[in-house]
């Protein structure tokens, strides 16, 4: 009984194995000799990955489609297309000639490159704006600005406003005194025996009072 079961198992396993057919003769191939090398059958890509033909990779893998967004001035004419092969698929890769890679690194105290593990927790970033002195719109330093023309005509405090008006009309070494105003300005009356003061160019003189006879 055991031998019958064993024979049936061997027979079933022999029938389940695929048979190799010789395309020239059309008969099943015999066992190869020890010196003969059996050629391996070539498998098609669709047999290994049958689902790759169902995925539209040409629409998903569009390399360089976002590069014109960074440089719209170049347009489609400024981009160079390079063909590449991705298995059974073909596509085009767009490269901008004026785009260069940017490498950002942080230097240590001795000028050595630091890895991400050696970087300090609180990174310090220094920003600034450099303006050329001859660039239009640049602000010169305070020491080189020179005297402004508005300083001479500037507004002075109340106590110095009168002194400025007097100093503009004076010359060094000559000081003039304001003339004596009339008595009406001071609300004073001249006595009967005195004369009013007479105005002169060099000052004021007062005549002696007339003696009554």
Curated annotation (Swiss-Prot):
Where along the sequence do coiled-coil regions lie? none
What cellular component GO annotations does this protein have?
Answer: basement membrane; cell-cell junction; extracellular matrix; extracellular region
The segments labelled Disordered in the record are 22-43, 162-213
Ranges of compositional bias, category Low complexity? 169-180
- Tell me which InterPro entries the record gives: Amelotin (IPR031501)
GO terms classed as biological process: biomineral tissue development; cell adhesion; odontogenesis of dentin-containing tooth; positive regulation of enamel mineralization
Protein's UniProt keywords contain Zinc-finger = no
Query: Span of the secretion signal?
Result: 1-16
Q: What does the entry report about post-translational modification of this chain?
A: Phosphorylated by FAM20C in vitro. O-glycosylated.
Please note every region of biased composition (Polar residues).
33-43
Q: Which Pfam families match?
A: Amelotin (PF15757)
> What are the entry keywords?
Biomineralization, Cell adhesion, Glycoprotein, Secreted, Signal
Where does this protein reside within or beyond the cell? Secreted
Q: Tissue-wise, where is it found?
A: Specifically expressed in maturation-stage ameloblasts.
Q: Which family does it belong to?
A: Belongs to the amelotin family.
User: What is this protein for, i.e. what is its function?
Assistant: Is a promoter of calcium phosphate mineralization, playing a critical role in the formation of the compact, mineralized, aprismatic enamel surface layer during the maturation stage of amelogenesis.
Under which name does UniProt file this protein?
Amelotin
């Amino acid at each position: 009984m055991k031998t019958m079961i064993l024979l049936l198992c061997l027979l079933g396993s022999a029938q389940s194995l695929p048979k190799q057919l010789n395309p020239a003769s059309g008969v099943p191939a015999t066992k190869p000799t020890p010196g003969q090398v059996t050629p391996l059958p070539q498998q098609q890509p669709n047999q290994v990955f049958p689902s790759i033909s169902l995925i539209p990779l040409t629409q998903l893998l569009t390399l360089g489609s976002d590069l014109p967004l960074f440089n719209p001035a170049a347009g489609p004419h400024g981009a160079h297309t390079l063909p590449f092969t991705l298995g059974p698929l073909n596509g085009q890769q767009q490269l901008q000639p004026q785009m260069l890679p940017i490498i950002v690194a942080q230097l240590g105290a001795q000028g050595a490159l630091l890895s991400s593990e050696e970087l300090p927790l609180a990174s310090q970033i220094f920003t600034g704006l450099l303006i050329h002195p001859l660039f239009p719109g640049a602000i010169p330093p305070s020491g080189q600005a020179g005297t402004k023309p508005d300083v001479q005509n500037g507004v002075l405090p109340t106590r110095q406003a009168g002194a400025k008006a007097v100093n503009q009309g004076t010359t060094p070494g000559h000081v003039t005194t304001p003339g004596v105003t009339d008595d009406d300005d001071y609300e004073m009356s001249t006595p009967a025996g005195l004369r009013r003061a007479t105005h002169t160019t060099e000052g004021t003189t007062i005549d002696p009072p007339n003696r009554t006879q």
